[in-house]
Amino acid sequence: MPMQGAQRKLLGSLNSTPTATSNLGLAANHTGAPCLEVSIPDGLFLSLGLVSLVENMLVVAAIAKNRNLHSPMYCFICCLALSDLLVSGSNMLETAVVVLLEAGALATRASVVQQLHNTIDVLTYSSMLCSLCFVGAIAVDRYISIFYALRYHSIMTLPRVQRVIAAIWVASVTSSTLFITYYEHVVALLCLVVFLTMLVLMAVLYVHMLARACQHAQGITRLHKRQPPAHQGFGLRGAATLTILLGIFFLCWGPFFLHLTLVVFCPQHLTCSCIFKNFKVFLTLIICNTIIDPLIYAFRSQELCRTLKEVLLCSW
């Protein structure tokens, strides 16, 4: 499976092996070749997962509470938060099980651990696919709201958005279940294709939106006979925002999909084996992305922040 390291870690913990690395990483050790391996403490990983879990739960609760936020855009943001919640939750669950197995606090059979591993894999990959798809859906929604403003409410109707959301969830869960059960490497290629598609989609749409915004700002500048630097400053700020948005997406997701690509194309190569040993680092970056997503897409909304305060006050 693409997550060979995680599976070996679960089964290795069950059998009380001294180390919990992937079989690819062990092969690299036998060669004696030096590998750069970054260790992520379980406590840090679980702490980041908990922050992501709480943060995204608050986003879902705030959107569910306020009927004014039941618009197409916030539906996509809510689903993004829910999928990010599942990404962090599934990885936290696996890490917690490994810790309990290693501590001897959880006794179970290898077959049960294998079933648990497959279940976590399905949950992880389906939620990752959903997260990627909903990031792309938000980009499309923003694009339509800008370039088809007069037709937006006729294009992005709530029933149509609900069908899109249902299709994304069903397709992600179904494909992850089938591919992880029957075709081990296909799920890696599927995730890679979705990642590259969403990256290109976001880049094209946001660059087009930035270019149109710069043209609009330039038109206003000419209309009011202002100096060009004002327009240039707007363009630089927009370019910086776009760079940060795409950069965070690529830096957080890119290493994980590099891992999946190498698992498919060079599973036994020495250099690839060294990269596989840092699989937990790549998962940690994805968890960091699930923490950043609400800051980018949700908490910039004043309406949502007000509702979030109400949710927090009610919880006390």
From Swiss-Prot:
Residue ranges that the UniProt entry lists as topological domain Extracellular: 1-37, 94-118, 184-191, 266-278
Pfam families in alphabetical order: 7tm_1
GO molecular function: melanocyte-stimulating hormone receptor activity
Places the protein is found: Cell membrane
Glycosylation sites: N29
Entry's transmembrane regions: 38-63, 73-93, 119-140, 164-183, 192-210, 240-265, 279-299
Topological region Cytoplasmic: 64-72, 141-163, 211-239, 300-316
GO terms under biological process: adenylate cyclase-activating G protein-coupled receptor signaling pathway
PROSITE patterns found in the cross-reference section: G_PROTEIN_RECEP_F1_1, G_PROTEIN_RECEP_F1_2
GO cellular component entries: plasma membrane
UniProt keyword Transcription present: no
UniProt keywords, alphabetically: Cell membrane, G-protein coupled receptor, Glycoprotein, Lipoprotein, Membrane, Palmitate, Receptor, Transducer, Transmembrane, Transmembrane helix
UniProt topology in membrane: Multi-pass membrane protein
Lipidation (S-palmitoyl cysteine): C314
Subunit structure comment from the entry: Interacts with MGRN1, but does not undergo MGRN1-mediated ubiquitination; this interaction competes with GNAS-binding and thus inhibits agonist-induced cAMP production. Interacts with OPN3; the interaction results in a decrease in MC1R-mediated cAMP signaling and ultimately a decrease in melanin production in melanocytes.
Membership in a protein family: Belongs to the G-protein coupled receptor 1 family.
Primary role: Receptor for MSH (alpha, beta and gamma) and ACTH. The activity of this receptor is mediated by G proteins which activate adenylate cyclase. Mediates melanogenesis, the production of eumelanin (black/brown) and phaeomelanin (red/yellow), via regulation of cAMP signaling in melanocytes.
Name used for this protein in its record: Melanocyte-stimulating hormone receptor
Source organism per UniProt: Cebus albifrons (White-fronted capuchin)
